[in-house]
């Protein structure tokens, strides 16, 4: 049974401009330490950050809160399995809310094309 659905789209150029203005401080607001390592290794840092931003916004919407009510960007970590499938790991208040919703499965899809990055998150319980 689906208990949450969230979608977000981010304009890559807008994220690149925020990075140019604020430098790494902007990235640190969005990314966890493990994601920052990947960010530094990325050849397209603006695109990388836009995809993570969209994924975390989509996840927060699926929980029903958005980035508010104690839920922060750092409550979400995006990684990948060995085949490249994106994985969403929850911590902090986001993990607590997911537990209250009895979430057992999290599905994350991330896509980007020229100007935009988008993500969809589905939360399921049995």
UniProtKB/Swiss-Prot annotation:
Its cofactor is Mg(2+). It catalyses: apo-[ACP] + CoA = holo-[ACP] + adenosine 3',5'-bisphosphate + H(+). It is found in: Cytoplasm. Belongs to the P-Pant transferase superfamily. AcpS family. One of its GO terms (biological process) is fatty acid biosynthetic process. GO terms for cellular component: cytoplasm. It comes from the Bacteria. The gene is acpS. Mg(2+) binds at residues 8, 57. Keywords: Cytoplasm, Fatty acid biosynthesis, Fatty acid metabolism, Lipid biosynthesis, Lipid metabolism, Magnesium, Metal-binding, Transferase. This is Holo-[acyl-carrier-protein] synthase. Its main location: cytoplasm. One of its GO terms (molecular function) is holo-[acyl-carrier-protein] synthase activity. Its EC number is 2.7.8.7. InterPro entries: 4-PPantetheinyl_Trfase_dom (IPR008278), 4-PPantetheinyl_Trfase_dom_sf (IPR037143), ACPS (IPR002582), P-Pant_transferase_sf (IPR050559), Ppantetheine-prot_Trfase_dom (IPR004568). Transfers the 4'-phosphopantetheine moiety from coenzyme A to a Ser of acyl-carrier-protein. It holds the Pfam family ACPS.
């Amino acid at each position: 049974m689906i208990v949450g659905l969230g979608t977000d789209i981010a304009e890559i150029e807008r994220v690149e401009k925020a990075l140019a203005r604020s430098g790494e401080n902007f990235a640190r607001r969005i990314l966890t330490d493990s994601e920052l390592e990947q960010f530094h290794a990325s050849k397209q840092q603006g695109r990388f950050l836009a995809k993570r931003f969209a994924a975390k916004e989509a996840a927060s919407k699926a929980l029903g809160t958005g980035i508010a009510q104690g839920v922060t960007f750092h409550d979400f970590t995006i990684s990948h399995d060995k085949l490249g499938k994106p994985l969403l790991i929850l911590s902090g208040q986001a993990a607590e809310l997911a537990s209250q919703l009895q979430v057992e499965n999290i599905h994350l899809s991330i896509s980007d094309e020229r100007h935009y990055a988008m993500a969809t998150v589905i939360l399921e319980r049995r």
